[in-house]
């Protein structure tokens, strides 16, 4: 028995009833054993189960104690809900009461509609409050009362109180048993016997009373436990069911109550819109009246009074500043004798709890206050005085405050004289910096990097549309959205700031010190290009604000434009289509295409559909992996406009890992500006810094180390091909009179003039002239392409890169030349359906060799990897004496050759008699690359204006390398194998004229200004070397060959003559005679006449509408792509017209 008691003490409180141990007894077993003992005490085995009863009671007591603790916590939580609900009901009743009173005020002030609405909402609140009160009563009656009854009744007290009667009965039984056991052993000892064990049967009769008491207390305890089980289980759950029904009734009744007002609420919403419109109109009229009164009074704001000051505070400060005529500092005026620079010591009050004065070394220079720290290893703090205000302390004559944009500095000078000096220097330095900023000047200590930044900003401001605000059209915007690349006015920029940096990040071009990395998008987007996408679907009437619009109108429009993308063009129907467009935009390096998919709501950091270097690559991974110094703007746009820079590929590599793996320090700079997580590891357990160290990428390692230590400067410079505008152009003296203005009027884009083969890769498309976007053409300068090689599929001279001219007719798939034509100096062979962009250059001509039309262009140094324009200021090629010629002179050859070729193969013009003179073209190939926006017709016209239409005497011809034989007749020329294209379908072409229609030897004056297509085709079919065949679709619309001037035909005639008569050269590389010397321009002032070759419908009021075949008298030039003139004989029909839509008449 003692051992049983000791075992009971080892039980853990964690044991539970449903995890009974073997020495416990169940209720059914207790009943059976007790009944048996009651009927037959001597044969019963109940005494052996006494220990089990004791163990069972102990474990039951522990379980009840655990339940008591849990139910007390439940009761506490429910009471808290009830109390807070009562408070909520009381607050709702108060709210309903004051709302009803407020509505009554409206009813008494001739606003019955608004008053009724407030009263109805008050009634609704009261009804809902009543329902909530009923719900809380149900909670109190069903849950709280039940828990209170249980905890204060059956479970009252502490652990062990319930089993005290049982413990007493157990103790009495054990005492009596010990006493009888001792007596039996003594009795046996007296008779010389030893009793080792006493059975229950022997003492059954003697212990019956104590055993019956034990059984009674055990039975009482089990009955009590059973009652508690019922109350804490079944009864409590039944009351929770009642509360559940009360909750259901609460929500159902609440919904019914709210539905009663549904129709009224819908009608009220419409009425409120009309009321708001009326009130807005009143406000607008009052605002206009206020501004009118203010302008007439010219009062200082302090004299106007509190009402005006309050209205100023509520209105936009930016709006009020923009209406001021000039800037007035309204601040301290320092003593100019102290200058604007000073070094010394000041006492600065610390920001800690103690607020102690600390002595700090300070310096003022170039508008910057430098405050050194106590330790020399920390970088000093630098404050831009332009954004600070100096405020003297009225209480202490030696103290003053410096209020910056984010904190206030408290300074104290050593004495009053030193105080005056510091105040004066700070004020003078700030005033000096402000004056320099307003005048556009810079400090004397600027370096080349600041010069570059200034040049970039100037170039950005010259982009199309950047002279007005992107949102409201205000002139001269100076606030830049660095993540969108657009310029806004100060009023609209304030709304951009309110939207948050995840939508638009605003910086000032004048007040902020920008790094070149913050100008990447501004250099490549521009307001016009951005609005072509984001405002493509503006409704009519347009909701776009004007410069005079108030802030409410601006905010509604800007939010719809930038947050909702409500006015953008939609081109993709599904998310997969958007991802495909995103992939193509990155591959083709097309920023505008990227902005288009961004406007359509694509998730920029979604894994791309096409597998890349690693599974799970995003567009940013791909952009970084393929980035170079020409595509950083794509990386910048993705970095600034995507949400999560920590996206990982399938192997755990983030974009930072890619920068280290592929050695992209410039991309890394752009990424670190947005503060991504730098310590993410991939599957190999490496961070981006670990990879940079392993691969010895020192630049990436340094940048990542700076970012990890928090020392990275976000205003960082990036190495990028800026392609800035060149101010000093390589031009002759004759050009100075006609030099166009650097800022051009932007017009609606015309069809592109470059046709490309489908085999061109997306990366190479950007290098092709036809793929230059209007914004690129507007900002690239005269010399931007002097060092550039445009690789096309068929040309020995680059086609004009302008996109303003109509498209050239493409070659049909089955009509390409089958062999290398004789006039293809680059050795290019074109197939029927595909072409290549890699051209092999021939060796340069030997020294002394004169340049002719059949020679290839001079080898130019290769441009940067993007095949775009390389940095400005470089010249190439040997310069001849004709360098100072008219700027259109050297491009006359390009006008003839490029216009006579398709995108799939060269087109050789029909030959003309050799009497027609050629110009000297020593620098034609060089100059043909200079102008990027001038169509071929422009140069053709200029060349005709600058030369006398007469033939030089034969004696002036230079020596010829090969003597030319007499010119054979057309019918005597047999076709050469490989030179003739397949015969065109005659059914698709106009009737062929007879050969007799062609003059045998036309003079310059006899040449028609516009030969017919039939004449040229007749020559081609009769045996002339010609690779030019127009598609039937183009022939039916217009005669493209008719665009060529007689000079063009004469040049090709001599070129073809040379190829036929040279016997010592191969057919594919003919030798041509040296062209005739160039004549001096003496007819520069003659009237210029042009003939229209296409129909043109005016897009703007000042443009000229015409049809094909009309003659226009040129009266001026708006810029190099748009001329001014009127229809011949109809001077009332005048306006500007595109040069690429006309053909210059030679007269």
From Swiss-Prot:
Give the Phosphotyrosine positions (modified residues).
308
Tissue localization of expression is:
Expressed in all tissues examined but a most abundant expression was found in the testis, brain, lung and spleen. A heightened expression was seen in the adipose tissue from obese (ob) and diabetic (db) animals.
What keywords are assigned to this protein?
A: ANK repeat, Cilium biogenesis/degradation, Cytoplasm, Golgi apparatus, GTPase activation, Membrane, Metal-binding, Phosphoprotein, Repeat, SH3 domain, Zinc, Zinc-finger
Q: Give the free-text PTM comment from the record.
A: Phosphorylated on tyrosine residues by SRC.
Q: Which GO terms describe its molecular function?
A: GTPase activator activity; phosphatidylinositol-3,4,5-trisphosphate binding; phosphatidylinositol-4,5-bisphosphate binding; phosphatidylserine binding; SH3 domain binding; zinc ion binding
Modification sites for Phosphoserine = 732, 741, 854, 858, 1026, 1045, 1059, 1146
Q: Where are the zinc fingers (C4-type)?
A: 469-492
Predominant location category: cytoplasm
- Taking every annotated instance into account, which residue ranges of this chain make up the domain Arf-GAP? 454-577
Q: Where is the composition biased (Acidic residues)?
A: 728-737
Quote the biased-composition stretches of kind Low complexity, using this chain's numbering.
Answer: 792-803, 824-837, 892-903
Q: Which residues carry this modification: Phosphothreonine?
A: 1066
Mind telling me which InterPro entries this protein's record contains? AH/BAR_dom_sf, Ankyrin_rpt, Ankyrin_rpt-contain_sf, ARFGAP/RecO, ArfGAP_dom, ArfGAP_dom_sf, ASAP, ASAP1_BAR
State what changing residue 913 to A does: Significant reduction in binding to SRC and CRK and decrease in phosphorylation. Loss of binding and phosphorylation
Compositional bias annotation for Pro residues: 950-961, 974-984
Keyword Zinc: yes or no?
yes
Residue spans with biased composition (Basic and acidic residues)?
A: 738-749, 919-929
- What does the UniProt record note about how this protein's activity is regulated? Activity stimulated by phosphatidylinositol 4,5-bisphosphate (PIP2).
Of the GO CC terms on this record, one is: podosome
Q: Give residue spans, biased composition: Polar residues.
A: 750-762, 1033-1052
Domain of life (superkingdom): Eukaryota
Instruction: Report the record's disulfide bonds.
Output: none
Q: Which PANTHER family match?
A: ARF-GAP WITH SH3 DOMAIN, ANK REPEAT AND PH DOMAIN-CONTAINING PROTEIN 1, ASAP FAMILY MEMBER
Q: What is this protein called?
A: Arf-GAP with SH3 domain, ANK repeat and PH domain-containing protein 1
Organism this protein belongs to: Mus musculus
């Amino acid at each position: 028995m003692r051992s049983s008691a000791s075992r009971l003490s080892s039980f853990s409180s964690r044991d539970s009833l449903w995890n009974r141990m073997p020495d416990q007894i169940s209720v059914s077993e207790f009943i059976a054993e007790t009944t048996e003992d009651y009927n037959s005490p001597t044969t019963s085995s109940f005494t052996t189960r006494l220990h089990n009863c004791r163990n069972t009671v102990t474990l039951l007591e522990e379980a009840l104690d655990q339940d008591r603790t849990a139910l007390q916590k439940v009761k506490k939580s429910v009471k808290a809900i009830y109390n807070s609900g009562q408070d909520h009901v009381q607050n709702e009743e108060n709210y309903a009461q004051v709302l009803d009173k407020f509505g009554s005020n409206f009813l008494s002030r001739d606003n019955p509609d608004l008053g009724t609405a407030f009263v109805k909402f008050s009634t609704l609140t009261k009804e809902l409050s009543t329902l909530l009160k009923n719900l809380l009563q149900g909670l109190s009656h069903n849950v709280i009362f039940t828990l209170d009854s249980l905890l204060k009744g059956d479970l009252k007290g502490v652990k062990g109180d319930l089993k005290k009667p049982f413990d007493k009965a157990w103790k009495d039984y054990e005492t009596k048993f010990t006493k009888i056991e001792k007596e039996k052993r003594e009795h046996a000892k007296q008779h010389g016997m030893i009793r080792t064990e006493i059975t229950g049967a022997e003492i059954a009769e003697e212990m019956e009373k104590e055993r019956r008491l034990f059984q009674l207390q055990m039975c009482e305890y089990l009955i009590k436990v059973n009652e508690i089980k019922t109350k804490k289980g079944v009864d409590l759950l039944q009351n929770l069911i009642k509360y559940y029904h009360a909750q259901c009734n609460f929500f159902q009744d609440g919904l019914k109550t709210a539905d009663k007002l549904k129709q009224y609420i819908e009608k009220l919403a419409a009425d409120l819109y009309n009321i708001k419109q009326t009130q807005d109109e009143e406000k607008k009229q009052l605002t206009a009246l206020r501004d009118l009164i203010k302008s007439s009074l010219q009062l200082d704001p302090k004299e106007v009074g509190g009402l005006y000051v309050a209205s100023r505070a509520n209105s936009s400060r930016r709006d009020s500043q923009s209406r001021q005529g000039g800037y007035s500092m309204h601040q301290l005026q320092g003593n100019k004798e102290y200058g604007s620079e000073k070094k010394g010591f000041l006492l600065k009050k610390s920001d800690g709890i103690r607020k102690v004065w600390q002595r700090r070394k300070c310096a003022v220079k170039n508008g910057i206050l430098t405050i050194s720290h106590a330790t020399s290893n920390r970088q000093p703090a630098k404050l831009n005085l332009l954004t600070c205000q100096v405020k003297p302390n009225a209480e202490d004559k030696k103290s003053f405050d410096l209020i910056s944009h984010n904190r206030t500095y408290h300074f104290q000078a050593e004495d009053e004289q030193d105080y005056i000096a510091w105040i004066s220097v700070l004020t003078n330095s700030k005033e000096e910096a402000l004056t320099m900023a307003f005048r556009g000047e810079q400090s004397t200590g600027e370096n080349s990097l600041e010069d570059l930044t200034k040049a970039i900003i100037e170039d950005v401001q010259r982009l199309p549309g950047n002279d007005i605000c992107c949102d409201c059209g205000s002139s001269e915007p100076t606030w830049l959205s660095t993540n969108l690349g657009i310029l806004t006015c100060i009023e609209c920029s304030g709304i951009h700031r309110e939207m948050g940096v995840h939508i638009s990040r605003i910086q000032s071009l004048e007040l902020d010190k920008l790094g070149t990395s913050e100008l990447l998008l501004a250099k490549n987007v521009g307001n016009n290009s951005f609005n072509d996408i984001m405002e493509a679907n503006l409704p009519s009437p347009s909701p776009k604000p004007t410069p005079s619009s108030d802030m409410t109108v601006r905010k509604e429009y800007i939010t719809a434009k930038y947050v909702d993308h409500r006015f953008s063009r939609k081109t993709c129907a599904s998310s997969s289509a958007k991802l495909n467009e995103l992939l193509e935009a990155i591959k083709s390096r097309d920023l505008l295409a990227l902005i288009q998919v961004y406007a359509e709501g694509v998730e920029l950091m979604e894994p791309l559909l096409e597998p890349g270097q690693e599974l799970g690559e995003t567009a940013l991974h791909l952009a970084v992996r393929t980035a170079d110094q020409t595509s950083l703007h794509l990386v910048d746009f993705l970095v600034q406009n995507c949400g999560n820079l920590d996206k990982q590929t399938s192997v755990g590599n983030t974009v930072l890992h890619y920068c280290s793996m592929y050695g992209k320090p410039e991309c890394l700079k752009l990424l670190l500006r947005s503060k991504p997580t730098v310590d993410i590891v991939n599957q190999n357990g490496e961070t981006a810094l670990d990879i940079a160290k392993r691969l010895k990428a020192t630049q990436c390692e340094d940048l990542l180390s700076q970012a990890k230590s928090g020392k990275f400067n976000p205003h960082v410079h990036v190495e990028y091909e800026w392609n800035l505008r060149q101010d000093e152009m390589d031009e002759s003296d004759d050009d100075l009179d006609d030099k166009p203005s650097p800022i051009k009027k932007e017009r609606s884009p015309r069809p592109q003039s470059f046709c490309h083969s489908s085999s061109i890769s997306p990366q190479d498309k950007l290098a092709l002239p036809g793929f230059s976007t209007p914004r690129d053409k507007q900002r690239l300068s005269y010399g931007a392409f002097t060092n550039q090689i445009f690789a096309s599929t068929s040309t020995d001279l680059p086609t004009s890169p302008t996109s303003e001219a109509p498209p050239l007719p493409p070659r049909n798939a089955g009509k390409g030349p089958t062999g290398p034509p004789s006039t293809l100096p680059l050795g290019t062979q074109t197939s029927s359906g595909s072409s290549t962009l890699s051209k092999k250059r021939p060796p340069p001509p030997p020294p002394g060799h004169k340049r002719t039309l059949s020679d290839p262009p001079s080898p130019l140094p290769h441009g940067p990897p993007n095949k775009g324009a390389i940095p400005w200021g470089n010249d190439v090629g040997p310069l001849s004496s004709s360098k100072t010629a008219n700027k259109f002179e050297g491009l006359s050859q390009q006008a003839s050759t490029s216009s006579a070729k398709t995108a799939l193969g060269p087109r050789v013009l029909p030959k003309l008699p050799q009497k027609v003179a050629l110009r000297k073209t020593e620098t034609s190939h060089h100059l043909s690359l200079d102008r990027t926006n001038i169509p071929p017709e422009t140069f053709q016209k200029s060349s005709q204006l600058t030369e006398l239409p007469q033939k030089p005497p034969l004696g002036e011809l230079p020596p010829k390398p090969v003597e030319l034989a007499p010119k054979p007749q057309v019918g005597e020329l047999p076709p050469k194998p490989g030179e003739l294209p397949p015969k065109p379908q005659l059914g698709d072409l106009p009737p062929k004229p007879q050969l007799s229609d062609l003059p045998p030897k036309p003079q310059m004056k006899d040449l028609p200004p516009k030969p017919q297509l039939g004449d040229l085709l007749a020559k081609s079919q009769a045996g002339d070397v010609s690779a030019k065949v127009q598609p039937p679709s183009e022939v039916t619309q217009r005669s493209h060959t008719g665009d060529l001037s007689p000079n063009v035909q004469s040049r090709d005639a001599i070129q073809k003559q040379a190829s036929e008569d040279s016997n010592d050269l191969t057919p594919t590389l003919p030798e041509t005679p040296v062209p005739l010397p160039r004549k001096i321009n003496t007819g520069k002032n003659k009237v210029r006449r042009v003939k229209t070759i296409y129909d043109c419908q005016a897009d703007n009021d000042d443009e000229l509408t015409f049809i094909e075949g009309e003659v226009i008298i040129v009266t001026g030039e708006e810029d190099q792509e748009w001329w001014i003139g009127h229809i011949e004989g109809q001077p009332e029909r005048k306006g500007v017209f595109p040069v690429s839509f006309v053909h210059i008449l030679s007269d």
